[in-house]
Amino acid sequence: MANEPYIVRDISLAGWGRKEIDIAEGEMPGLMALREEYAAKKPLKGARITGSLHMTIQTAVLIETLVDLGAEVRWASCNIFSTQDHAAAAIAEQNIPVFAVKGESLEEYWDYVDRIFDWGKGETANMILDDGGDATMFVLWGAKLEAGVEFPAPQNEEEEIFQKTVRRRVAATPGFLTKTAKAIKGVSEETTTGVHRLYEIAKKGELLFPAINVNDSVTKSKFDNLYGCKESLVDAIRRATDVMLAGKVACVAGFGDVGKGSAASLRNGGARVLVTEVDPICALQAAMEGYEVVTLEEAAPRADIFVTCTGNADIITLDHMRAMKQHAIVCNIGHFDSEIQINSLANMKWTEIKPQVDLVKFPDGKEIIVLAKGRLVNLGCATGHPSFVMSASFTNQVLAQIELFCNTDKYQKDVYMLPKHLDEKVAALHLPKLGVHLSKLTQKQADYIGVPVNGPFKPDHYRY
């Protein structure tokens, strides 16, 4: 498989991709600063990074930063709908192996995950950069299978295809994924769902290499998850449906950082926003922000637009969808497609209006509009978060890769956070672009509150 240098939609799109990448670089000061800081040191020289993260223009800037810092990279998207084909083409044109096409089948998706581990010449990856945990799960389950542990019964079509692909790799190159797992110095994980998977694996004692939780860096979760969703959610809904948000009733399921950004996004568009929550603290936050907190059973017949962002499963059920209004819009901005019971609609009549926009007709004649087949709407129906906020997230990713690759002996087979001083560094790198002038503590002031003059300024437990 390593013989194919790339799989993209159309390599001739590379020129268009390069133009957008050039513009994005101007909006991604953190990554560009790291290129300058580490230009001579090349701290990732010798790193072979298997990357599974949405293949967008912004990710192209991340990939080229990793390469500038000395790494070799093989890349796939972490979602079947999120690739921007011109971005993938631009990366392929730079002779960086990339396997990503917008609108992949599930078979293609898992084949591409397999390919990013296939370095050829007997080599393996020694680092993983992950978003959602699929690449990590691929190598961990491969090693389990090679150790004689059997898969549990698959619960859905995707699990069947995942298991089939891992089995194929194990049969083709016995011992390869065990060898890969032993070579991995660490994984940096981008998103809430992937981090949850890592903590579950670590709790069972089954994590085979160290991991850094990038998602819970303040400059990721409080910016990408919040401000990113605040801009990208309504962009996706409008591009997909041309709906006017003003005056509509929208329901946001979940009021974590993504839910907070999503609710603000819809409110800023003029919608009246309902919120559903299971956590009393988040529910109280939503209520005190002025949102009406209800159950989904109460929201189903009232709302015009539904957005899930819980990271959980079966949030919007078939019964909820049956109770919805004619032409209610249903979408998800959580990482996986488990939040909406899309499989329960399999026997309904589906009419594709345009890519990633489907009209689903119930037996009684009522129709709802499903976006991106329940997968990430902001990347399926639009282009995701703006470059600037992704610069903060991806600067964390690069720092995590450097930390794990260069300081491997500091880490056990567990999940870690980036230290506070690096979190503050990421923020500081983005201030000049916004014209921010930081105040500076005097030594007396620093002593008074018990912090160094140049930080870190907050304890690890501080809630921003």
From Swiss-Prot:
Its EC number is 3.13.2.1. Substrate binds at residues 56, 131, 190, 220, 224. InterPro entries: Adenosylhomocyst_ase-like_sf, Adenosylhomocysteinase-like, Ado_hCys_hydrolase_NAD-bd, NAD(P)-bd_dom_sf, S-Ado-L-homoCys_hydrolase_CS. NAD(+) binds at residues 191-193, 225, 254-259, 277, 312, 333-335, 378. GO terms for cellular component: cytosol. It is found in: Cytoplasm. Its main location: cytoplasm. Keywords: Cytoplasm, Hydrolase, NAD, One-carbon metabolism. The keyword Plastid does not apply. The keyword NAD applies. Its cofactor is NAD(+). One of its GO terms (biological process) is L-homocysteine biosynthetic process. Binds 1 NAD(+) per subunit. It catalyses: S-adenosyl-L-homocysteine + H2O = L-homocysteine + adenosine. Pathway: Amino-acid biosynthesis; L-homocysteine biosynthesis; L-homocysteine from S-adenosyl-L-homocysteine: step 1/1. One of its GO terms (molecular function) is adenosylhomocysteinase activity. Belongs to the adenosylhomocysteinase family. May play a key role in the regulation of the intracellular concentration of adenosylhomocysteine. This is Adenosylhomocysteinase.
